Each structure stands twice: as C-alpha cells, then as structure tokens.
C-alpha cells in the first residue's frame, strides 16, 4: 500500500511507514494512492464481521503485510459486535459502543495497536494523542501494557465527562495523561507542534493515535460494511448514513467505504454548535470560530483534522461536495431529541441523538437511514439522567474505573512544558 502526503504529494510512504510516522511533512495527512474497487460486494456482505474485515483490509493494504499476520490483527482487534437496531420505520442505529471502552474508537484504537506492534521494528515508541473524550480511553486500553510503547494523552481540563476521564486516567503503567488548561483545539495544536519538532520526534520515537493515523481510519471502514450487511436486502439500494462529526475521521472512513463500492447513496455530517463544516458547505467560506462547550463534548472541535482527507476523496472521485448533507443541533435541540427518542423506546446519548435528528430532518421517503451511535449512554450518565429523568446503571467496566483515583498531571497550554515532559517520560 502506497500513500502520499496531501500537502506534499511527492512525499510517498508505505503503510508501515505511515503507521509508524503518523503525520507527514508540515503536518500533512497521509492518504492512499489507490483505493481499489471491490467487485464482490454482495459476497462480502454475506460474511461475518471479522472474516469480511480481513478481506477488506487485505485489499486496502495490498500484500504489504502477510495475510496471516493481518488476519490475526483483525481477529485480535474486533472482538465485539456492532449491532444494527431499528429505531423507527426506515431509521436504524449502528451501535458502535460494545467494545471494552464503550465507544466507536475501540475499533480503530485496537487495530492501530495491533498494526503498530506488527510494523514498529526495534526501539521505543511514544504515542502522543489528544482526546475530546473517547479517543483517550480507546487508545489507553488498546496500548496498555505493551512493551516499549509509552502513551501520553492530552485532554482539555474540565471539558470531558467525569466517566470518560476515569476510563483512561486511572491506568498508570505505560499510560500517562495530562489535563491541559485549554480547549481541545489547543490540545491538537500541541500535538501538531510536537510532530513538527524533528529532534523531539527522533528522540522519543513519536507517533500519534488520533484519527490522523491511517491505521485507525482503515479499521473504521469495516463497520460501515457491517451496517449495510445487517439491513434487509430490499433496503440496501437507497442508504443514507448520518455521522456525528468532530474531527471528521469517522466520515472519512465512510467515504472510503463508499469508494470501495459499498452501496451508500449519500452521507450526512452532523455537528453540534461547533459547526465549521455545515457553515462552509452552505457559504463556501472556511471560518472556524472559537470552540464552545456542548453536551456532545467529543464533537467540540472547530478545526477538524481530517477535513483535507474528505475534500481529497470528493475531488478524486469526481463527487460534488455540495452532495454531502450536513446539519447542526443546539444543546436544547439535542435534549428535545433525546426525549423524543426515549418516547420511541430507544435510549441514546447526545452525539447519537444529533446524528439521528439531522438524518430524520433530511431523509426522503424512498431512503433508508442509518445513524452512528458512537458511545454508550452511560458514558454521559450525568447529562442523560438529568435530561431524561432516569437512573442509568453503570456497565461493569465503567463502574470498576469509576472507583479508581485519577492519575493525571496538569499543564498549561505551553509547548515548552510539554516538550520537557515528553523527554523525561
């Protein structure tokens, strides 16, 4: 598999190099030179998740890893289901929260850990990543205890849910967590500064586990196939998928699935008040505003890292960017939507609720809608209980971590401090 740097197309790397490096020159994102057209989609849709994913990832990575190695990586990573649940006539929820940290990022985080272990070679690696909520837990649990890999996770202090924080800030060992006195965009900027520091990168073997790492995106492609595979065959012709969007990695993965030949008619990018992309699609002006805190904190992102990949896919496929649906919900609208979903017998959380409502508003009578549920409602226990007036029992994994003390360090939004911290980690 060959990839190129979107900013500097002359910079070309293999899959193994892209996994190890994370980012290219000038913080450029790596992107596959070729995305093959799969001609056996119907056959693939008949297979179970793991076997189908082994074939999809085998086609994408294209022989760079032995198929037996890749098969083992997928089998070890995808140890949990992604069920499709009917919410109402023609609208389905793809539940991506049945993994060990109860969020969709378990798919990408666990596959990336497997990939890095397979291609890293000798020497220590430091994973530096920023999280607005779920990435931190998925990465921490995927890499916890792996030899010669240290993990440092930055997150905005006070801007993620207490349960999210407990899931990744209580492990210790090779997992270090840092609460930054700033918002998530500032955390991402610190990560990018670290990657621009060539001396630092070489000194600590720097890598990233954010969705900028191609291995995470490729893993996420697989659950779009799983969604369509669970639909009745008569409903597979006019499928619309609504994706709750923050950094836009999830949407990028869906667009790669469509490029491979998965029959998805169109996508809808659903955001909260941090609506840089919906405004851009309407006006043509890229105008990120100051990030605001919302109920759906994992989408509190004003400068989405993966947007260049989205534009690259539209350009390469000859698609019109205006065909990408979009919409946003305020917090009060999100609360109303959660109540409406509860009345239909479906318990959700803010991110999934936004994806549901934006989909419902834009779905045509002839279409079948799927919205992505990216986290278990209990991960947002306080807000969901307040809004719906219910008591949510904690799943066992959350309850266990909720009893443990936080092990985080705290730091100002200061790259010099972070650099010194990384060098002594």
Curated annotation (Swiss-Prot):
InterPro entries: Ser/Thr_deHydtase_PyrdxlP-BS (IPR000634), Thr_synth_N (IPR029144), Thr_synth_N_sf (IPR037158), Thr_synthase-like (IPR004450), Threonine_Synthase (IPR051166), TrpB-like_PALP (IPR001926), TrpB-like_PALP_sf (IPR036052). It is an enzyme of class 4 (lyase). Its EC number is 4.2.3.1. GO terms for molecular function: pyridoxal phosphate binding; threonine synthase activity. The modification N6-(pyridoxal phosphate)lysine is found at residue 105. Pathway: Amino-acid biosynthesis; L-threonine biosynthesis; L-threonine from L-aspartate: step 5/5. It catalyses: O-phospho-L-homoserine + H2O = L-threonine + phosphate. Keywords: Amino-acid biosynthesis, Lyase, Pyridoxal phosphate, Threonine biosynthesis. One of its GO terms (biological process) is threonine biosynthetic process. Its cofactor is pyridoxal 5'-phosphate. NCBIfam families: thrC. PANTHER family: THREONINE SYNTHASE FAMILY MEMBER, THREONINE SYNTHASE-LIKE 2. Catalyzes the gamma-elimination of phosphate from L-phosphohomoserine and the beta-addition of water to produce L-threonine. Belongs to the threonine synthase family. This is Threonine synthase. It comes from Haemophilus influenzae (strain ATCC 51907 / DSM 11121 / KW20 / Rd).
């Amino acid at each position: 598999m060959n990839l190129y740097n979107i900013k500097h197309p002359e910079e070309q790397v293999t899959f193994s190099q892209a996994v190890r490096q994370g980012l290219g020159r000038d913080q450029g994102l790596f992107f596959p030179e070729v995305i093959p057209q799969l001609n056996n989609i119907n056959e693939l849709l008949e297979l179970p998740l793991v076997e189908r994913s082994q074939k999809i990832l085998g086609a994408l990575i294209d022989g760079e890893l032995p198929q037996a190695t890749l098969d083992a990586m997928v089998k070890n990573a995808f140890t949990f289901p992604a069920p499709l649940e009917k919410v109402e006539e023609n609208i389905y929820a793809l539940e991506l929260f049945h993994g060990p940290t109860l969020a969709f990022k378990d798919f990408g985080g666990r596959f990336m850990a497997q990939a890095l272990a397979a291609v890293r070679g000798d020497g220590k690696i430091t994973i530096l990543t920023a999280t607005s909520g779920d990435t931190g837990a998925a990465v921490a649990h995927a890499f916890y205890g792996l030899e010669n890999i240290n993990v440092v996770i930055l997150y905005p202090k006070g801007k993620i849910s207490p349960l999210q924080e407990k899931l990744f800030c209580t492990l210790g060992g090779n997992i270090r967590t840092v609460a930054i006195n700033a918002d998530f965009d500032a955390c991402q900027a610190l990560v990018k500064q670290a990657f621009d520091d060539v001396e630092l990168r070489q000194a600590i073997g720097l890598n990233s586990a954010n969705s900028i790492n191609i291995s995470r995106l490729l893993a996420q492609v697989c659950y779009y196939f799983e969604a369509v595979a669970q639909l009745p065959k008569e409903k597979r012709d006019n499928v619309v998928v609504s994706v709750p969007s923050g950094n836009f990695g999830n949407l990028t993965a869906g667009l790669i699935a469509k490029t491979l030949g998965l029959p998805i008619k169109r996508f809808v990018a659903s955001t909260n008040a941090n609506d840089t992309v919906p405004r851009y699609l309407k006006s043509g002006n890229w105008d990120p505003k100051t990030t605001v805190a919302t109920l759906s904190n994992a989408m509190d992102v004003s400068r989405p890292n993966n947007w260049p990949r989205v534009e690259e896919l539209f350009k390469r496929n000859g698609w019109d960017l205006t065909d990408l649906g979009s919409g946003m919900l305020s917090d009060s609208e999100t609360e109303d939507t959660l109540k409406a979903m509860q009345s239909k017998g479906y318990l959700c959380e803010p991110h999934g609720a936004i994806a549901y409502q934006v989909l419902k508003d834009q779905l045509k009578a002839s279409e079948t809608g799927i919205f992505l549920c990216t986290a278990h409602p209990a991960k947002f226990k306080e807000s969901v209980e307040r809004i719906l007036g219910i008591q949510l029992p904690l799943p066992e994994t959350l309850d266990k971590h909720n009893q443990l003390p936080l092990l985080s360090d705290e730091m100002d939004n200061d790259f010099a401090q972070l650099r010194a911290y990384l060098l002594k980690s």
